[in-house]
C-alpha cells in the first residue's frame, strides 16, 4: 500500500524553490494539504506578479526616506524573500538599500548554500551568502534603522512575543514614513494577525500585556505562498488517481470545497478529512 503525503506543496516555482515533482508510481492513499481550498485563486497572484507589486509598494516607502520591516519564518520564507528582494534590486525594479538579517535565519541561509547542489533549485549556482547583508544584532540602538532607508527581515513570521520581529514592530508602528510588510500567513491569536489587519490611524493592542498603541506606519500585506492553489491541488488528484484521499491542513470551508470538487470528478475515490485524535482507516 503506497502512501504519498504532500506536506506543503506548490506546483509553481518560487525564487529559489522549483515547482514540485509528483511521483510516477501508482498511489493508493494521498494525504493532501488543503490550505487554499477556500480561497478564490483569482485573489492569488503568481510569485513574479506579487514580486512586482511588492517592489512598487516598497519603492514608495524607500524613496520617501522610510524603512521596511518584513517579519519572516526563519526557514523557507526568509530565504525566498531575501533572494526575491536581491534579484529585484539587481533588475533595478527595487531601490537598492541596506538589507538587515540575523539570528537563526542567517544560519539556515548557510545550510541552503551548502546543500544547493544536492536538492532541486531554480538556480543551483545562486548563493544567499553573495547577497550583501548587515546583522541586525549588531545594532545597539533600533533608531539606527530609521536614519537611512533600509529593509529588515526578522523572525518570527507571526511577530510572536519576545522575538526580534515583535520587538522591531513596536518601533516601526511609531514611524509615519516607514512600513511593515507581511508576506505570509498570520494565525488569528498572534500579534502579526493584529498588525496585518490594521491600518494607519488604528489603535491596536498586540498582546493582553501591552498598552494600546496607534498605528503610524503603513501596513501592506502580500501573499508569497508556498502552498498550491486549490485547482492545482485537484490536479494532483487527477495525476495520481489514488483510491483514498485524506485532506489535511485546512479549515472546514477548505475541506468542503476540496472534497466536493474531488467527488464530482471521481465517484470511486474515498475522501476523508484529518483532525486531531481522529482515527482514519484506509485499508
For the regions a language model picked out, list residue spans one by one:
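His/Asp/Glu-rich metal-coordinating catalytic cores
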Residues: 1-80, 84-93, 98
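Core dinuclear metal-dependent hydrolase active-site scaffold
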Residues: 1-19, 143-145, 151, 157, ...
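Generic long, charged, amphipathic alpha-helical segments
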Residues: 205-235
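Proline-aspartate-enriched helix->loop->beta-strand connector
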Residues: 237, 241-247
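Hard-cation-handling environments
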Residues: 54-191, 248
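Active-site neighborhood of phospho(di)ester-bond hydrolases with catalytic His/Asp-centered motifs
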Residues: 4-9, 31-35, 70-73, 101-103, ...
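Short acidic, glycine/proline-enriched helix-loop-strand junctions
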Residues: 256-280
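A short, acidic, amphipathic alpha-helical segment used as a generic capping/interface helix at domain edges
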Residues: 163-168, 172, 225-239
Amino acid at each position: 500500500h503506497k502512501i504519498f503525503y504532500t506536506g506543503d506543496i506548490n506546483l509553481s516555482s518560487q525564487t529559489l524553490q522549483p515547482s514540485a515533482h509528483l511521483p510516477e508510481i501508482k498511489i493508493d492513499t494521498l494525504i493532501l494539504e488543503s490550505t487554499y481550498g477556500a480561497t478564490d485563486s483569482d485573489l492569488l497572484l503568481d510569485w513574479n506578479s506579487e514580486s512586482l507589486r511588492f517592489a512598487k509598494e516598497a519603492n514608495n516607502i524607500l524613496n520617501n526616506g522610510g524603512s521596511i520591516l518584513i517579519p519572516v519564518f526563519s526557514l523557507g520564507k526568509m530565504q525566498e524573500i531575501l533572494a526575491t528582494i536581491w534579484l529585484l534590486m539587481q533588475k533595478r525594479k527595487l531601490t537598492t538599500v541596506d538589507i538587515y538579517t540575523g539570528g537563526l535565519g542567517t544560519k539556515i541561509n548557510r545550510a541552503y548554500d551548502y546543500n544547493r547542489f544536492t536538492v532541486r533549485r531554480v538556480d543551483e549556482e545562486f548563493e544567499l551568502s553573495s547577497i550583501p547583508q548587515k546583522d541586525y544584532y549588531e545594532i545597539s540602538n533600533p533608531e539606527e534603522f530609521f536614519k537611512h532607508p533600509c529593509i529588515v527581515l526578522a523572525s518570527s513570521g507571526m511577530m510572536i512575543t519576545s522575538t526580534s520581529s515583535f520587538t522591531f514592530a513596536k518601533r516601526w508602528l511609531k514611524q509615519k514614513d516607514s512600513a511593515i510588510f507581511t508576506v505570509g500567513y498570520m494565525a488569528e491569536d498572534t500579534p502579526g494577525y493584529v498588525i496585518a489587519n490594521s491600518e494607519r490611524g488604528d489603535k491596536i493592542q498586540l498582546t493582553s500585556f501591552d498598552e494600546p498603541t496607534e498605528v503610524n506606519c503603513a501596513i501592506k500585506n502580500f501573499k508569497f505562498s508556498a502552498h498550491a492553489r486549490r485547482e492545482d491541488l485537484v490536479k494532483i488528484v487527477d495525476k495520481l488517481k489514488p483510491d483514498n484521499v485524506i485532506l489535511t491542513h485546512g479549515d472546514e470551508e477548505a475541506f468542503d470545497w476540496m472534497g466536493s470538487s474531488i467527488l464530482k470528478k471521481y465517484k470511486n475515490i474515498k475522501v476523508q478529512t484529518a483532525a486531531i485524535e481522529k482515527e482514519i482507516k484506509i485499508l
